[in-house]
């Protein structure tokens, strides 16, 4: 019998119910329909320092900055999959999310191999591919299979709620969640 699968979903937007959230909620419903436990954590509006490469995490087993990154590391270790979602700012992810991911991946020393990763980006129009690539690098350097969809994992909208109208983007998120489910169950 297979254990209950868990997916940790990080929302890199500073807006809890913004356009990036629309993408995550589309995925979350597919996961729930497949009996997969989810947790969405808002990261983009938190005060998270960047990594200072002090190396203390090698001695202490966690980041020297005792904030939500250490809590996320515990949740990430227990999860079978990780979804990282970000709005696009100047063809890049939210800087707070990047600071979080740098520290999360560097300071957590558990084996990430074969945990399934997926990145999701939300933009008005441009910069998605660069941001998508930026986020996927955390997975690929960690030996994590990267889930894909039938198109780039992006949803489009600028003003609050606009991404609700992106039918293709929402379908891309549902397909992404189904593909991620398949990989986690494999």
Question: Could you describe each region identified by the protein language model?
Answer:
Residues 4-8, 28, 34, 71, ...:
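Glycine-rich phosphate/pyrophosphate-binding loop and the adjoining helix
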Residues 46-76:
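Cysteine-cluster motifs in flexible loop/terminal segments that predominantly coordinate metals
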Residues 14-15, 45, 124:
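Short, glycine/serine-rich, charged loops/turns that create anion-binding
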Residues 23-31, 135:
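Hydrophobic residues within alpha-helices
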Residues 5, 64-145, 150-151:
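Helix-loop-strand module that forms the ligand-binding subsite of alpha/beta enzymes
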Residues 14-23:
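Glycine- and acidic-residue-enriched helix-capping/strand-helix junction motifs
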Residues 36-46:
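A short beta-strand-loop structural module common to alpha/beta enzyme folds
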């Amino acid at each position: 019998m297979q254990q209950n699968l868990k997916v940790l979903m990080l929302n890199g937007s500073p807006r809890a119910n913004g356009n990036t959230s629309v993408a995550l909620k589309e995925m979350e419903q597919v996961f729930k329909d497949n009996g997969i436990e989810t947790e969405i954590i808002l990261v983009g509006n938190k005060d998270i320092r960047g990594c200072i490469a002090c190396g203390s995490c090698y001695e202490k087993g966690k980041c020297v900055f005792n904030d939500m990154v250490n809590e996320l590391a515990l949740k990430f270790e227990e999860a079978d999959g990780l979804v990282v979602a970000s709005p696009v700012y100047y063809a890049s992810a939210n800087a707070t999310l990047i600071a979080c991911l740098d520290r999360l991946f560097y300071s957590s020393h558990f084996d990430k191999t074969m945990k399934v990763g997926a990145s999701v980006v939300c933009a008005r129009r441009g910069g998605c591919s660069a941001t998508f690539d930026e986020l996927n690098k955390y997975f690929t350097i960690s030996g994590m299979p990267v889930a894909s969809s039938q198109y780039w994992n992006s949803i489009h909208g600028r003003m609050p709620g606009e991404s609700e109208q992106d039918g293709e983007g929402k379908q891309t998120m549902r397909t992404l969640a189904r593909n991620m489910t398949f990989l986690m169950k494999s």
